[in-house]
Amino acid sequence: MNKKKLIENRLNVRSYYYFYALLKKNHILKKLVSFLIIALIFNACSNKMQVTSIQPSSIQLNNTSAEDEAIKALIEPYKSVLDNEMNEVLINSNAEAVKGQPESTLGNLIADITLWESNNILQKKNLPLADICMLNNGGLRTSLPEGKINVGKIFELMPFENEVVVLTLSGEKAQGLFKYIAKSNGMPLSGATLEIKDENAENIFIGGKAFDPSKTYRVVTSDYLAGGGDKMRFFNEPIAYQVLNVKLRDAIINYMRAENKKGNSLNPKTDGRIKSN
């Protein structure tokens, strides 16, 4: 079997970017990956076999280990393709976006982008728009720099394969969402404002209107959080659950590309949407 064809069949370039970023920084890990690739090739090209015994052994890898030039040459074409894709500049940012609480430049930016992109998709499908977006601070894995932002940086920010979903919540469930935000001293939020007092959410406004517990609200989030991740149990048993068939990371990339084509740049900022006393 042709080795290059085998690698093409086995590797999804985009899905493995985050691992590749680690690989670039870790010489020992690079050696281990080389060993695993060789094992994969021999396994794929061989007839069916059964394991009859296992004999463990130690393979010492450190920064004095020589690179395997054959494996390096095999990987190089795919590394080049990956580098070209990840180095694409998506947009310029007028300021650094960083995490923080109760609100932050990064949390506000990503929540706003996610709500905007989600409503674009819903509008094209003639579906009701979402009212708010709520994400989690733990899902934002790095800051975004001032200046050029490339695809690779968004993969660092969002290395997960989380999908964007829209949940329709009862007023009671939505109240639980805001209570969670208050107890957490803030989460990435868009479309709503509130004040945190003694770990309670007060003066809640959604779309400029006072929160009404008798109404239902449509919330954009990730499938991970919608499934109860980070103990967000208020998302359990929603009135409705819609999958938008777009990854959270891709929604961010799509927005940045589109805004850049319009000649726009990012302006990360805080605006008082979550106040803590």
Residues of each region from the PLM?
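N-terminal secretory signal peptides that target proteins for export/translocation
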Residues: 1-29
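Generic hydrophobic, helix-prone segments enriched in Leu/Val/Ile
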Residues: 15, 72-79, 192, 201, ...
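Helix N-terminus capping/helix-initiation residues
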Residues: 29, 67-68, 150, 247
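Sec-dependent signal peptide recognition
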Residues: 30-35
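C-terminal motif of bacterial Sec signal peptides marking the signal peptidase cleavage site
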Residues: 41-44
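Feature captures C-terminal
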Residues: 48-60, 115-117, 123-277
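Hard-cation-handling environments
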Residues: 54-143
